[in-house]
């Protein structure tokens, strides 16, 4: 047994560790953490927006995006189908002008399937330089 009398004459050290104080401390720490944890999870102050069932009439109308077309040879066309071919610098200036006219302008990039990605990347960079954040890509759906 680990507890012997003082007069036993056995000079060997006590081999068992008393774990009762360790368990007591751990249980107290567990209780403290359990109490403080809910307070810590809700410490971020947020003001969440409220939603209403009404929508603006303006939101119901579809927004006509500004079309940026890139042909197979890397030519850029800003606007409708009858638009003339422009260089990438002119693309950026036209996108800036469109952004000044309408703050929420949407750009739809229609790139040919065979165009190199570098041309698409330049168009995306021009839109970023113009401050446009709403960009979409035009694709065709497969006929079933």
Swiss-Prot record:
* Gene3D superfamilies hit by this protein: 3.30.420.270
Q: Which keywords fit this entry according to its UniProt record?
A: Cell inner membrane, Cell membrane, Membrane, Protein transport, Transmembrane, Transmembrane helix, Transport
Compartments, as annotated in UniProt: Cell inner membrane
Gene Ontology CC terms: plasma membrane
GO BP terms: namely: protein transport
Record GO terms (molecular function) = transmembrane transporter activity
Q: Does the keyword 4Fe-4S feature in the UniProt annotation?
A: no
Q: Which residues cross the membrane?
A: 19-39
Q: How does it sit in the membrane?
A: Single-pass type II membrane protein
- Where does it mainly reside? membrane
Which ranges make up the Cytoplasmic topological domains here? 1-18
Record topological domains on the Periplasmic side: 40-144
Alphabetical list of InterPro entries matching this protein: ExbD
Superkingdom of source: Bacteria
On assembly, the entry states: The accessory proteins ExbB and ExbD seem to form a complex with TonB.
Q: What does this protein do?
A: Involved in the TonB-dependent energy-dependent transport of various receptor-bound substrates.
Q: Could you say which protein family the record assigns here?
A: Belongs to the ExbD/TolR family.
The identity of this protein, by name, is Biopolymer transport protein ExbD
């Amino acid at each position: 047994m680990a507890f012997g009398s003082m007069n036993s004459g056995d000079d060997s050290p006590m081999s068992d560790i008393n774990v009762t104080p360790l368990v007591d401390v751990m249980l107290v720490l567990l209780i403290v953490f359990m109490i403080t944890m809910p307070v810590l999870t809700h410490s971020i102050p947020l003001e969440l927006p409220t939603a209403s069932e009404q929508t603006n009439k303006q939101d119901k109308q579809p927004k006509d995006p500004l079309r940026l077309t890139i042909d197979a040879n890397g030519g850029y066309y800003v606007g409708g189908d009858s638009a003339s071919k422009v260089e990438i610098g002119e693309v950026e200036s036209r996108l800036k002008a469109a952004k000044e006219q309408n703050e929420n302008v949407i750009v739809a990039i229609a790139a040919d399937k065979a165009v190199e990605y570098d041309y698409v990347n330049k168009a995306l960079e021009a839109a970023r330089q113009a401050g446009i954040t709403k960009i979409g890509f035009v694709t065709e759906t497969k006929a079933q």
